[in-house]
């Protein structure tokens, strides 16, 4: 039986205990039998132990066993005493060997035998004693001689021999006299039927074999080698027959050590015939035929291990699995052994162990180690693996949870092998289960929660690829989701982990490529998820793989580089996909052309060159959208790897060399495509030199190939770009001959600028060349025609973006450093002279409208190049009977130009005056002023813009003609009279008829007329006449709408009419107020007239449109001021409406919710009106009641840096002027304004580009509301009392600070001191000066 070392009793400590003095033990007296005292030992209790008596007792078989047992027990007790033990060891220890061995060999009583073996073991364990070697010698002799025969006594001897060989302090080999005889006797004993004896023999053989190989004892090893064939056969037979786990364990241990030393492999290599003859010689009872009929060793081994594999003892199973592993792995060619074991169903037993193992680590590891070897027999093992597939999946769960599990790789290999060999074996639930486990492994690997072996990472990627090929893979969305997440984790882990290597990246990219192939295949089941998967692949490439690849390309080997490029190429091949287009643009924005040639420099192989040029050709197909990448593919075999070599080829004559011509076409295409994306493959000087050489040497072929316009224009783009960069960066010489040839080709042959992709700088260079003006005019006409039909081509590249040719052409015109504006105006002039090409005129006018809409500043260059004269010529050619689309388009252009042109430009171009007069005359010839059509509305809008520009000193004479035009005076009065006559029905009439549009344009024209009057008729207008009655209209020299009519329109009109009429009234009253102030006049109107106006305006103070409410409050404030000057404010003392307005405002500002600036702005009209009442000489008494101490204190309490506006500061200043603030409130206000000022300085100046007003653009439309809305915007942004939308934060802040400064000056004036704000202002000014 096999014993662990821990089972051995150890008494070494006995010799290390305290011992008495050496003289302590005196000589013992003779024993009762008269034996000498020298062989008698005294114990600590005073007793005497005679060794001869003990020997006679244990050796005599006639002595009762109880006496023997007692003697052994007494000896055991005595030995436990240190002095006794020391005396025994010093003189008499060897006297015990013979009697104990004799007793062990002659006693059948098991308990006595056990006592004897324990005694022997105890004696041998003492380090200072050599008695163990005597026991080994005597027992081995007994076993070698075979004198005892195979009996139960022999069992005790075998067991004792095994125990002795387990003692480490005994030199076993040197005291076994005849190793061959001993081993022969033991091997023969294996044929005995007793399982106990076989177990002890196997244990003894195991210990003997282990000892020989450990000490490398040549004799012992030779004996084992000679007897190994027979030993192997008998051991396997014993293993196959036994049902005892202890016997199995000993046998497996013996076979394992033989297998580890290669003896099993050597035995297997011997031929069956020689083995049989040896056995015949050894055993005459066997014939050669009988031996030959026995099963071969591999089959015997397979049958023998099945029993241990079925054992319920996990230790037996583990040891057996280890035996299988060593048995197979020691073979130089183990395929035959594996084949036999698989055919004998050993794999099925192992899978069953896995199924029942409950994922115990040792069992799982041993099973996986053997199964990994079995997988070498691919053909036979596949079928067995299918049976055990569920068990392997269960193990995968366990392995996937353990970081760097030692058999991680083996498990994954089994999964991969089964799925790849039998794609249909995995059900949808199993596929989902596997995908989820692998996803978690990759996720934890990326997060560094667990480790993965490099091979394990590769197999996981391979398993996913195999899973994608299974029929049930795409049946559930969860599987594809797991794949999507796994893909992302695998790439990120490969790129970001410290231990990244190119091999791992290669496998991750392989998975990425296969996933993309799967999700783009037509056989994919879940189309929606596949689209998401494809997007995921592209996102991973763009967000992670591409940036890493571009930055760390030198760390990637060639194979990984090819794999990454293959994936990128696969995406590009889906050129119909929007994301493929975006990916291509991302590549070129990262200088992919330069990067590709850099890769060719690192890996100059045919595979790399082919991959790069094919990818570049696909990139060109997508970017240029003309399938021109075929030029690169056609010349693939002869293209060089260096851009410098491409330039060299480009500079050669190729008229007689088709292969060279093909290379040159590809080179031109590559340099052209890279250049439009600002990717420089070579120095511009070298490129220009090669291009010039190419042009000069191949001018004949260029002329012959002029039909291939894209190829020519690729050359033009490259040439123009190099020339433009040469002008910008440095001055270098260039070939006049090459330039002449290029200009000749462009002037003499037809080409289309919109048919190719071109760089902005190249386009700009072309339009700077006066020599090709004729050809450029033709190109402009093509651009206009494409723009007219909406067939714009986005083929110009600049500022890192691809835009339409029209857009960049507009930019050229706005910049003005080229002939684009001049050529465009000249083209329109030519068409105007011909007078029969209306469609061409319309296309050019539409193009100009588009240009001005894109870049409003282009209006200035168009005007400076004479567009006004051309427009005047066109307008003069129209009559009422010949109006058409061209006239409407022309009016739109005039409107657009006047919205964006600078007044200074209009001042130097007299043609705009003529245009204005023509349009005014056109309007005067219309039949009616009410039923205005589209042209009438636009003309009125244009006249309004002319009046608007007069405020800045431009078109003053034209404006004077407009405001004094008798037709306009009559038409405006007619429209207003009709509208006012409707009364309350005006709103309904506006919805049902065109009176609303006519009235809106009429009021807008009137507003800009009022603003222009002080410029064009300075001092000649009596503003008092605007208070007159309607009967005096014909006596007025200018356009006029009386105040009461404006009030009617404000009261009854629609929201837009209310708004425009309110601005007209505000403008009118402002002019009147200035006249009254300057001339110190009195109002020439009755009190009832003003009362009716105040009734309307007072009601509109609470209008929903804050602009109308503000205008009404401002108008009402001016009227109250006039009345106050004449002492007509008695009605305020009793007016409950004005008091209600003031109370509503004060209560609202005193509420805590007024902290919002929006809420304060809502009450701005009431603030204006309240300020006006506070400024009256005869203030209403109730103001003091409204603004009592508690109300004002609450208002001050609510002030903060957000809601303090210019109006709020004015309000409190007027309250202080009216003595409604006490000193404490003034102090609090002063402190609040100081905090607000500090906060403004802390915030600094905001980015004024955020505040910058974007120029409004009028597209080519026929909706009157667009024109009207623009004019309303223009009116609102330039009206009194309303800050312009272009007003910056800094300007608004300055207004508030100025009002605070005035408030502080008022405080200092009243108190005779310098305010803190004034002092702070002085300090800041001093700091700025310093």
Swiss-Prot record:
Its main location: nucleus. Keywords: DNA-binding, Hydrolase, Meiosis, Nucleus. Expressed in flower buds. GO terms for molecular function: DNA binding; hydrolase activity. GO terms for biological process: meiotic DNA double-strand break formation. Residues 1310-1330 are annotated as: Disordered. InterPro entries: ARM-type_fold (IPR016024), PRD1 (IPR044968). The keyword Transport does not apply. Interacts with SPO11-1. According to PubMed:28855712, may interact with SPO11-2; this is in contradiction with PubMed:9461215 which claims that it seems to not interact with SPO11-2. Binds to DFO, PRD3 and MTOPVIB. Facilitates an interaction between PRD3 and DFO. The N-terminal domain (1-802) but not the C-terminal domain (755-1330) is essential for interaction with SPO11-1. Involved in DNA cleavage that forms the double-strand breaks (DSB) that initiate meiotic recombination. PANTHER family: PROTEIN PRD1, PUTATIVE RECOMBINATION INITIATION DEFECT 1-RELATED. This is Protein PUTATIVE RECOMBINATION INITIATION DEFECT 1. The gene is PRD1.
